[in-house]
Structure formats: C-alpha cells, structure tokens
UniProtKB/Swiss-Prot annotation:
Catalytic activity: (2R)-O-phospho-3-sulfolactate + H2O = (2R)-3-sulfolactate + phosphate
Transmembrane segments: none
Class in the EC hierarchy, top level: hydrolase
MF term (GO), any: 2-phosphosulfolactate phosphatase activity
Keyword NAD among UniProt keywords: no
Name of the protein in its database record: Probable 2-phosphosulfolactate phosphatase
Protein biosynthesis is among the record's keywords: no
Organism of derivation: Clostridium botulinum (strain Okra / Type B1)
Family: Belongs to the ComB family.
Gene name as annotated: comB
Length: 239
C-alpha cells in the first residue's frame, strides 16, 4: 500500500485524486466535528464552501437542518452552531442534517471530489479509520486541510498517528518522503497536544478560550465511527 500526504487544501491536485482513496484530516476542528456529529446520530453532513450556499440549502430544504461552521474560528452570524465538536451532542443532532461550512476542512473535502473514496478522519477516530483503510486495501492519499492554505503541524502529526495505526495492522506500507516524515514526527512526539501547543492554529484557538475544544480534539480513538463522503453527503461508512 502506497501512502502520500498533501499538506493543505490549496495543494490538492484534483487530477491526481482520480480513482484514489483519500483521507481528509482537519483535527482543529472540522473533521472532529463531522466525526462527532455522525457518531451522535446525525443523519448526514453536507459540506459547503460558502455561507450563502449553506443558508440556501437550509431555506429550501424540507429536512430538519442545523447550520454549523466558522470563519477564522468564529461562529458564522445566523448559524445554529460554531465549529466546536462539543456543540454537536446527540440531543441536538440525532436524526438531523448538518450543513457545515468552515475555513479549511470543508474546502479540502470539496476539492477532493475526484477521489474514488473519501473518508473523514481525526485523532478521535484514527484507529477506526485505519481499519477501514485496511479493508479497502488501496493506495492512499492523506489530505491535511491545513490553515488558510498553509501547512499545519496539527493535521500533519495526526497523519503520522494514522500511519502508525496502519502499521499496527499491516507492515506492507510504502511511504512517500513526506509520509515518512509525518510518521517520524509522531513516533518522537506521542504526546501530540504538548507538541502542537506552539503551533499557529492551536494558539489561535487557545486565544479564543477554546481550551475544552482543544482537549477534546486531541483525544485518541474515543470514537469507533468513520464518516464517508458519498453522493454529496457525509454519512456513516459501512466499510
């Protein structure tokens, strides 16, 4: 199994994704939100690029819609929820559709539509994602959403942890140089949150008093669910 990493949403080459399995990672916080919402019984998540598109879907839909997302880590005016996974509890999201728009994560998802399979991962479900990848048994591209188009160490080290979870299942992994680097960084910094504390995005969220979000997002493998993008929606994968 060949594994490569793309360092941000801006670095995605859509042609390269054709017929590939792709993993989207944005641990702070979009993929943590999506994983949490799906685990708590959300019917589906619709990832969109713009606030206007999200509001149009909510306006025209007959479904029970929750609008969620952020711009520059802040809740969008007129939306029900921000991009905090702690808001997407079972009593709010069960059986409902979440329309989500974020600065980085939903852009990475929307830029990956050419892929054969798109799975959503974060630290909170990495082992479950690794099991799904093993079942697919296909070459893999891990896409880091990044921060405003730039490299983000939090997504990168999460990629390294995901690779390590895969190594615990199978040994026939062929890593690109960047994938080897991500795995090396994780193996030498297994206390991920301590390593990431000086990162730009982490510091931004901490400055907004979002320590509880950070604490939640840096937990490993508390959820045994893998969301999958399919036909316009993100649902619970049956892989």
């Amino acid at each position: 199994m060949n594994i490569d990493i793309v360092i941000s949403a801006d670095h995605i080459d859509e042609k390269r994704l054709i017929n590939k399995t792709v993993i989207i990672i944005d641990i702070l916080r979009a993929t943590s939100v999506i994983t949490t919402a799906i685990n708590n019984g959300c019917k589906k998540v619709i990832p969109v690029l713009t606030v206007e598109e999200a509001k149009d879907i909510a306006k025209n839909s007959k479904e029970d819609i929750i609008l969620g997302g952020e711009r520059n880590a802040l809740k969008i005016d007129g939306f029900n929820f921000s991009n905090s996974p702690l808001e997407y509890t079972k009593n709010y999201v069960e059986g409902k559709t979440v329309v989500l728009s974020t600065t980085n994560g939903t852009r990475a998802i929307n830029n990956s539509f050419n892929a054969k399979t798109i799975l959503i991962s974060a630290l909170i479900n990495s082992k479950a994602t690794a099991k799904a990848i093993d079942k697919l048994n296909e070459d893999l591209i891990i896409i880091n959403s990044g921060t405003n188009g730039q490299f983000s160490i939090d997504d990168f080290i999460c990629s390294g942890y995901l690779i390590d979870c895969l190594y615990n299942i199978r040994k026939d992994l062929e890593l690109s140089d960047i994938a080897k680097t991500a795995h090396y960084i994780y193996m030498n910094n297994k206390d991920i949150e301590s390593f990431v504390k000086k990162a730009t995005h982490y510091s931004r969220l901490k400055s907004l008093n979002l320590e509880k979000d950070l604490e939640y997002c840096f937990q490993k493998d508390i959820i045994d669910v893998v969301p999958q993008y399919k036909d316009g929606y993100i649902i619970k994968s049956n892989i």
